[in-house]
Amino acid sequence: MDRQKILIADDEPAIRLLVSRMLGEEYVILEAADGEEALDIAERQQPALILMDLMMPKVDGYAACLRIKADQVTKEIPVVMLTAIGHELNRRFAEEMGANGYITKPFTRKALLEEMRRLLPPA
């Protein structure tokens, strides 16, 4: 059985490492350190799901999500925002940009997997 690809886009290496360790046995992990890199990887690799930080250099998570959802190649990829910003206005704005989910840091492996399974097609 092929493992699904998950893109983790976060400018904090510690967050990318944490999520990679949480998910690495079940999924193939792709990593991006900024929004621009996330857009490039999303188009080239077409992951099954993207976990994206809101506040990143070059292109922030809002703009990256909007561009992913506007692109014919990537528009169907679910995007889950992983952010320390838990304010409801931010959540609604992320949804307006096309985000399919929103998880506030710190998060548990269980919460992350539940949200991913809600959005991912069966492998």
Positions of the model-derived regions?
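C-terminal output helix
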Residues: 107-116
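Active-site beta3 strand of CheY-like receiver
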Residues: 45-51
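Receiver (REC) domain active-site loop signature in two-component systems and cognate sites
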Residues: 56
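Short hydrophobic/Thr-rich beta-strand motif most characteristic of the beta2 strand and flanking loop
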Residues: 27-33, 41, 103
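Two-component/phosphorelay signaling modules centered on CheY-like receiver
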Residues: 13-30
